[in-house]
Amino acid sequence: MDIRNEFLQFFQNKGHEIYPSMPLVPNDATLLFTNAGMVQFKDIFTGIVPRPSIPRAASSQLCMRAGGKHNDLENVGYTARHHTLFEMLGNFSFGDYFKEEAILFAWEFVTKNLGFKPKDLYISVHEKDDEAVKLWEKFVPVDRIKKMGDKDNFWQMGDSGPCGPCSEIYIDQGEKHFKGSEDYFGGEGDRFLEIWNLVFMQYERSNDGVLSPLPKPSIDTGMGLERVQALLEHKLNNFDSSLFAPLMEEISELTGLDYASEFQPSFRVVADHARAVAFLLAQEVHFNKEGRGYVLRRILRRALRHGYLMGLKEAFLYKVVGVVCEQFSNVHAYLKESKEMVMKECFEEEERFLETLESGMELFNLSLTHLNENKIFDGKIAFKLYDTFGFPLDLTNDMLRSHGACVDMQGFENCMQEQVKRSKASWKGKQNNADFSAILNAYAPNEFVGYETTECLANALGFFDSDFKEITEANPNQEVWVLLEKTPFYAEGGGAIGDRGTLFKDNEEAALVLDTKNFFGLNFSLLEIKKALKKGDQVIAQVSDERLEIAKHHSATHLLQSALREVLGSHVSQAGSLVESKRLRFDFSHAKALNDEELEKVEDLVNAQIFKHLTSQVEHMPLNQAKDKGALALFSEKYAENVRVVSFKEASIELCGGIHVENTGLIGGFRIVKESGVSSGVRRIEAVCGKAFYQLTKEENKELKNAKTLLKNNDVIAGINKLKESVKNSQKAPVSMDLPVEKIHGVNLVVGVVEQGDIKEMIDRLKSKHEKLLAIVFKKENERITLACGVKNVPIKANAWANEVAQILGGKGGGRDDFASAGGKDIENLQAALNLAKNTALKALEG
């Protein structure tokens, strides 16, 4: 049975609108990932946005529960039901039907469509929900209905937000399979398995814990697809179902092991984590040191460790990820389109971790022999595994699990000191929606006229302080927000900064517009008051001249993305952007740095479109029609049914609500000024056009003239070559080897800094001079510290030593056991690096 299609078809026949799965990265600052089907409907439930014309919805939503409040990562592989990524089937009512219909629909689908026997079904309800009990008694004997408290049967998304009592459908998997003392209905055992949760959304909980009735009672339900699939196939573990069979076969082929072996938990971890990695990478979450990217990194590294347990010492997960992409490509087409990029990025991240995995495992296994009688693992060692070898703390705890041990958390936290809690770094901060509820109830969305004009006459509907509390009057020197009846000011969005400008009253400057933002469909402008203004005042709103320069950079960004896709391939997609009056910044998915030839091609393509003077065209059309025309869209963006499409003839077509030039000739010229990496799999281009392009060219010409003067040569290249030759000749002079040499237990130890010379050559000379050697030499050059280290006839690995020291300098190293090099940009930490290098060597020699 195709459960997904069966579910959606059932509810479509019941008058529900079918919604696609929203991105795993939600447009919600309070959530790390989309963790439930109701996330995309949250603003409807709270009344922030109006309910849709069809007040019934159903979806099959991809969800992630790893990191943040809802975190199942540590349980995956050890239980029958936990997953990091799973699919949640759900039906929703926005003030339409309530408990009676929700219960009726659920019972019909479970018993008729899925075919579960009524005698095997049990129901839980909230202890105060007598109404639900009476409704269930129509289908289920009262002795199979159990009342439970808030802990089990009151659902809420977070500490605040929509919530309400819930009712759950359980299935008895059979007494013959479960003999534990907790295997009774309501117990902690697995015999009675929850399959569907019906939430009766009646309240909203405020930040201070107060429950308030929602505008209209609603329904939110959730049923795990993986769980239902296993039950229909009479499997007691989700991982034993046909959904996971292709992955288990691939893992078995890679390892040479049987799924039904002692390594079964590791099979399950790898299979689960491969799904999460595939979908997150395909949805443009990239490996990073913080936030969602760090959660992704933790998932991958946990999978690699379980692969290591099964004897896999080389990159392998990318192959399993490839199977995931193929398996789900018929439902999620983007997996097929991005398969090559996803596998490549996964492979490269695996290679990075495998460089340190072996050394980290050696340290871990050695430390296990020193466990105290309470089986507490040294927090300092756990921190070293985390900081030096890249082992996330939960990975170390996972490894300790089979030994009945755990990390000394106090010791770990002491070592961590006040480092940023990485897994929350990119999603902290909450918008207090309650503050806007009153505004949204009082004001309709204001009219934006900025596409047609940069100036208009408008009434000031209201003024608001920094907390968006309404004020009656705005006085000179205050900074306040204004809501205009209609506005020419474009609100920040699509990477473009918000418009600035001026408000005039009675032909006098009344306020400077510092910024413009959109909150829940209302365009607010931030003002610096020059002359007193009050609610109802009529003003002239005028956009500043920098609007045109912003438009130039915005249009250039569209041309840039098109050029990148032509030069690098269709896998390129936007990962972020910033559009200002003097520059643009564009982040995009690509696995490696662009070379000079590629950058030149991209720049030439953009300028070619500028010189063609292509006319811009703006159209409004249904979303599906726009996609059929080939319009580029942001994966993470949630679009309305009808969208605005901006095109420059054959050169570019994108979904965009921003301001653009009328024809590309107005852009003037385009120059790439920098290409860099943002994170694994994400590159960044910074560029200028328009006036900024002219100013850059002017400054470069001035510098060129100065260079000719300093070199005393009109041929700058020839002058530079002559200077380089002179420097090269001066460097050939022998460099003093005044490096301190200490003899420790018969080993010559050298730790020092030089001002000039080839430090690799110095290491070679030291190795030829001494029979037993530990040497590390630092050199400051080009605002960086570089280092080289050599080992001779001493049981210490140079690459591990160099890498550990490089961490303090903000870098990393690599090389062989007998020679390694490294570098970092944190020059101020040079003395600390010297101290660490020496202490590490001394500790090794004395140990």
From Swiss-Prot:
Disulfide bonds: none annotated. One of its GO terms (biological process) is negative regulation of DNA-templated transcription. It is found in: Cytoplasm. Its EC number is 6.1.1.7. Gene3D superfamilies: 2.40.30.130, 3.10.310.40, 3.30.54.20, Bira Bifunctional Protein, Domain 2 (3.30.930.10), Threonyl-trna Synthetase, Chain A, domain 2 (3.30.980.10). It is an enzyme of class 6 (ligase). The keyword GTP-binding does not apply. Its cofactor is Zn(2+). GO terms for molecular function: alanine-tRNA ligase activity; aminoacyl-tRNA deacylase activity; ATP binding; tRNA binding; zinc ion binding. Zn(2+) binds at H554, H558, C656, H660. Consists of three domains; the N-terminal catalytic domain, the editing domain and the C-terminal C-Ala domain. The editing domain removes incorrectly charged amino acids, while the C-Ala domain, along with tRNA(Ala), serves as a bridge to cooperatively bring together the editing and aminoacylation centers thus stimulating deacylation of misacylated tRNAs. HAMAP family: Ala_tRNA_synth_B. This is Alanine--tRNA ligase.
